[in-house]
UniProtKB/Swiss-Prot annotation:
It is found in: Secreted. Blocks the Nav1.2/SCN2A, Nav1.4/SCN4A, and Nav1.6/SCN8A sodium channels. Reduces the peak amplitude of the sodium current and negatively shifts the steady-state inactivation process. Does not shift the threshold potential of activation or the voltage corresponding to maximal current. Does not change the reversal potential of the sodium current. May act on site 1 of the receptor. Negative results: does not inhibit the sodium channel Nav1.8/SCN10A sodium channel. The modification Phenylalanine amide is found at residue 37. This is Mu-thomitoxin-Hme1a. Expressed by the venom gland. One of its GO terms (molecular function) is toxin activity. Belongs to the neurotoxin 01 (U2-agtx) family. Contains 3 disulfide bonds.
Length: 37
C-alpha cells in the first residue's frame, strides 16, 4: 500500500506517499506526507 497524507514516512524505504512527497514537518520535527506533488 501507500502512506496517506499527514502520516509519517521515510525517504529511504517504502511504502511511499500515496500523493505528494515525504517532507519534514517543522512544527512536529517528523517526516510526513505532503498534500501536493
Amino acid at each position: 500500500g501507500c502512506i496517506p497524507y499527514g502520516k509519517t514516512c521515510e525517504f529511504w524505504s517504502g511504502p511511499w506517499c500515496c500523493a505528494g512527497k515525504c517532507k519534514l514537518n517543522v512544527w512536529s520535527m517528523t517526516l510526513s506526507c505532503t498534500r501536493n506533488f
